[in-house]
């Protein structure tokens, strides 16, 4: 509440001198003779033409074309040409774009034919790439994907070496090499 009160007081304090000055100027009547307009050099100063041209660009010379940025294939702008798409297919398969007519035939209920901008849409077949047809087809073997009831086992043979060294409680040095036995082990991997 106090903030709004101080705000109002501040605004009044700033605007009262200006309001008093306007009332004093209104007390002096302006007398114009012969329907001449009152013109004061202090109020309307000379405005150079460079200021107007730089301030308002619509009056200035247009060195650049000021067009809005839009896509070439925008369906809402009446361009007679469409850009060719990026080559995602071979050049023989890319459609040839042509200049399309810009008129629409009149409807039967209208007395005279109307000319309207027609916005052609490009054929979208260039976006889909058809599957390649291979001339030399190779035979792909068919695999039976149905699981059988019994898992198949693959026999593998591994060589296992076992070293047997006999230590006795005697202080004699063993001069014979340890015995090496090779055993064939067959396992079934599932």
UniProtKB/Swiss-Prot annotation:
It is found in: Secreted. Changing residue 157 to I: In variant B and variant B2. The modification Phosphoserine is found at residues 148, 170, 187. Mammary gland specific. Secreted in milk. Its main location: secreted. Disulfide bonds join 32-109. GO terms for cellular component: extracellular space; Golgi apparatus; Golgi lumen. The record marks 126-127 as: Cleavage. Monomer or homomultimer; disulfide-linked. This is Kappa-casein. The gene is CSN3.
């Amino acid at each position: 509440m106090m903030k709004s009160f101080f705000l109002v007081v501040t605004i009044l304090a700033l605007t009262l001198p200006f309001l008093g000055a306007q009332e004093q100027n209104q007390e002096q009547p302006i007398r114009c003779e012969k329907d001449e307009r009152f013109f004061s050099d202090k109020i309307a100063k000379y405005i150079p033409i460079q200021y107007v041209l730089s301030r308002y660009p619509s009056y200035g010379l247009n060195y650049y074309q000021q067009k809005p940025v839009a896509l070439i294939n925008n369906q809402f702008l009446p361009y007679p040409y469409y850009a060719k798409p990026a080559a995602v297919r071979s050049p023989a398969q890319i459609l040839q774009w042509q200049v399309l007519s810009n008129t629409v035939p009149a409807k039967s209920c209208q007395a005279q034919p109307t000319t309207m901008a027609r916005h052609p849409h490009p054929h979208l077949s260039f976006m889909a790439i058809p599957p390649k047809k291979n001339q030399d087809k190779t035979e792909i073997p068919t695999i039976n994907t149905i699981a059988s009831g019994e898992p198949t086992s693959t026999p593998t043979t591994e060589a296992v070496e076992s070293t047997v060294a006999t230590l006795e409680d005697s202080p004699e040095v063993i001069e014979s090499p340890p015995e090496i036995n090779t055993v064939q082990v067959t396992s079934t991997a599932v």
